[in-house]
Amino acid sequence: MRQAGATGALAFGAPGLAVGEGLQNQPDALNTPKTESQAAEKYAHPPGVFINRPLTQVSRMAEALLDDMAGRNSDFFFNEASPRSGLVRDRAPVVGRSLSRVSSIAATGFGLSALCIAAKYNYLRPLDCEQRVEKTLAFLLEECPHEHGFLYHFIDIDSGQRLFGSELSSIDTALLLCGVLLCRQYFTGNTRIEALATTFYRRINWQWMMNGGTTLSMGWLPDQGFLKNRWDIYSELTTMYLLAIGSPTHPVPPEAWDAVQRPVVSYGGIDYISGAAPLFIHQYPHAWCDYRNLRDRHANYFTNSIAATRAHQLWCLVQGQKFPWIDQDMWGISASDSRQGYRVWGGPPSIGPLDGTLVPCAAAGSLVFLPAECSHVLLTMRERFGDRLYGRYGFADAFQPKVGWYGDDVIGIDVGIGMLMAENLRSGFVWECFMKNREIAHAMREVAFHPDPDANTQVL
């Protein structure tokens, strides 16, 4: 479906830097550290240095790869969506036709965002993207089942009906809403898209999802009511809370922002705020919302995610003692497929059991934090494993090179986080467009975001 004239295959023979060239002070692959402290000493930059790298510092080969990825990712979000509803499949096979009827509302949020990128760069015909967005928003608002504006986590791709007994999900509805609001700002000449997007946002009753507490519930089930767990510990929740606080119709109090616990953890001499969850929790908040050079009463969340990514890199290098293919050239583990099915794994702290599987979206979703390192990882994966790992929709979800296992599928949210972060690395387009939403600006004022005088992250 890629439009004729859009960027085609990777030009790996084109003039540019070889893999690894341009990366400063690359460590010796044969001298991998055995402990956390050794890893910190060998790989960690001095305090503050690793947050001073411009996002433009990637090789021309990396730029070509990211451009090619974006085109392939665009194909996923267009081809693997229902022509009737616009809902996006949760996953699709690397090779062959998908017959799955399972849609993820989070993947649909990433998909709406992908259509903006695809239209901007002509990866797809802009009119096709605009029409698909309009159809999707109309379906979400007029046909898709909901309660108080919240949608079920997994739904039928054509009817929108609930699947698997899944919950009304607050976080997944928020990820969907991010895509909706990005489309509102990008397709500004389409008054119907603007009206549908605004009405969709206004319908969501965030106050109801508080369920009488000080923080948002994780969800609701028709037969059981609200889930016991709440969004009360730091994770991917930050942009969701901004959407809730900035709601034009059902805002939650700004105090909900401060009610979230922000535990500080330390790894390899790096201190950062984190919950005990995989790397994606430090990626998703930054896909749409631009936190650079800003802080609230607690932290600068962009530099916090840089620190978390650096700690993850160090942790991966320690895992290389058990899995020697994990080194400074190839690292990154987040929730993904595995030979035994879907796994929520990663670290630090270690969440497993680990089996040496690597996850491309761990690096792709961290491109804005460690641009040179993460783009180098993606180039290495593509060059070493070629078509076994990199296909029509980009990278397979995960792979284990020792046993020669390459995932059969791509997963929508993993494709999406890599695509959006790559675009923010390349141009800042998603950030710039999304931050035009007045509700986000209002929410950031409400929770006291202000310029960080100590920030060293002016990157674009």
Where do the protein language model's features map onto the residues?
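N-terminal export signals
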Residues: 1-20
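Signal peptide processing junction and immediate N-terminal pro/mature segment
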Residues: 17-34
